[in-house]
């Protein structure tokens, strides 16, 4: 090669592979108010130091790759790289660590949950140096929160729209979830609404199948709503599931719901995707529709304790993307949910400011500034005997949703709805009178059965029903200390 055409490496660039921790592990780093902070549960492969594993997570979820590249010199790596700034062992677990990672805000597109997750939980979860990886929590800085519109309306606006205050809202998922004709489906909705429920609901997989096309369902459910409203004098709603195969079809269904004058639509935000969800949320805000969110597929992501993503992260993401309700588990029903963990992410959904509290699984203080709150929905295997516990656990700003606990009543849907409404009103009144729902709950329900035969029949049917299984997702504790106790 002639001297004129010879190319020399630029000064300062050295090709090859070097440990991630040399660049991305920075324990001396002081986090900024504008950083997005993440807490990862890291299980390294044998022989991989925790500092290297944490640094690898920071690198692969921000600016790094497996080898040094010359284009690093064309940007300010210190400005844009993620940093692992802390490592701590997980109590009671061998070879598991919490790695704290800080991401500069400029790594993320404004107002895009999709981009945020693509960066933070994109390729890194398949990284070979890690046996398992779980995103436990995120701190969203106020500077980034303000780029999101959040829920279409929020808790207070929903109460004003419905003219319902001072108690949890009551709902019911129509069962069987698949197979009913549109007319029979609408009839089931009407019976539940006239019996005293505030809402009925499409199940997550009710979209537009051969046995019941979406337009027919919307029409018959709207008829049920208006008929029940005329008879009861209360505002009613049905969560019309607008989830579809394309965003265009989803929005077409939402437009039709608005034209019918119904108050609320529904979306499966994980299977539908965050881009679709945010688009639907914007439409609902602009057109006065409430938005109910179902979390179908969440357990695929969040149920394993050492790999995936905790639901508190999915809950925060939903508040940013937009939704007025979201299913949150029940603590007492058939679906997964430990009490302290559940109450932790319920607060993250509803409150404006949440302090760090590791006893409830909250790793970071979170300030939502002016972003509206989301109503948690307790649903799954609950019935009238659970009403005192649900009222005590979730409080007024919640939706208590009884599917089988309404439709399984021996006298039919309307008496099932009556039983739930009577049980709720009895619990709210007892609480307001200063009684302890946690210790007097069963007595309160028994007293109410004396003047409600519908409630008495429901209590008899479900008196022996319990779902006593240990939760998979539990708080971290020192197992050796627990054994000594």
Curated annotation (Swiss-Prot):
Residue list for modification N-acetylproline: 3
EC class of the enzyme, as a word: lyase
Protein name: Ribulose bisphosphate carboxylase large chain
Recorded superkingdom: Eukaryota
Pfam families assigned to the protein according to its UniProt record, in alphabetical order: RuBisCO_large, RuBisCO_large_N
InterPro entries, per the entry: RuBisCO, RuBisCo_large_chain_AS, RuBisCO_lsu_C, RuBisCO_lsu_C_sf, RuBisCO_lsu_fd_N, RuBisCO_lsu_N_sf, RuBisCO_lsuI
Organism listed in the record: Guizotia abyssinica (Niger)
Lineage: Eukaryota, Viridiplantae, Streptophyta, Embryophyta, Tracheophyta
Keyword annotations from UniProtKB, A to Z: Acetylation, Calvin cycle, Carbon dioxide fixation, Chloroplast, Disulfide bond, Lyase, Magnesium, Metal-binding, Methylation, Monooxygenase, Oxidoreductase, Photorespiration, Photosynthesis, Plastid
UniProt PTM: The disulfide bond which can form in the large chain dimeric partners within the hexadecamer appears to be associated with oxidative stress and protein turnover.
GO cellular component annotations of the record: chloroplast
CDD domains named in the record: RuBisCO_large_I
Gene Ontology molecular function: magnesium ion binding; monooxygenase activity; ribulose-bisphosphate carboxylase activity
Function: RuBisCO catalyzes two reactions: the carboxylation of D-ribulose 1,5-bisphosphate, the primary event in carbon dioxide fixation, as well as the oxidative fragmentation of the pentose substrate in the photorespiration process. Both reactions occur simultaneously and in competition at the same active site.
Active site positions, chain numbering: 175 (proton acceptor), 294 (proton acceptor)
Assembly notes: Heterohexadecamer of 8 large chains and 8 small chains; disulfide-linked. The disulfide link is formed within the large subunit homodimers.
Binding positions (Mg(2+)): 201, 203-204
Entry binding sites for substrate: 123, 173, 177, 295, 327, 379
Note: The basic functional RuBisCO is composed of a large chain homodimer in a 'head-to-tail' conformation. In form I RuBisCO this homodimer is arranged in a barrel-like tetramer with the small subunits forming a tetrameric 'cap' on each end of the 'barrel'.
Propeptide: 1-2
Site residues (Transition state stabilizer), renumbered to this chain: 334
Catalytic activity: 2 (2R)-3-phosphoglycerate + 2 H(+) = D-ribulose 1,5-bisphosphate + CO2 + H2O; D-ribulose 1,5-bisphosphate + O2 = 2-phosphoglycolate + (2R)-3-phosphoglycerate + 2 H(+)
Cofactor list: Mg(2+)
Subcellular location per the Swiss-Prot or TrEMBL entry: Plastid, Chloroplast
Keyword Disulfide bond found: yes
One record GO biological process: reductive pentose-phosphate cycle
Residues bearing PTM N6-carboxylysine: 201
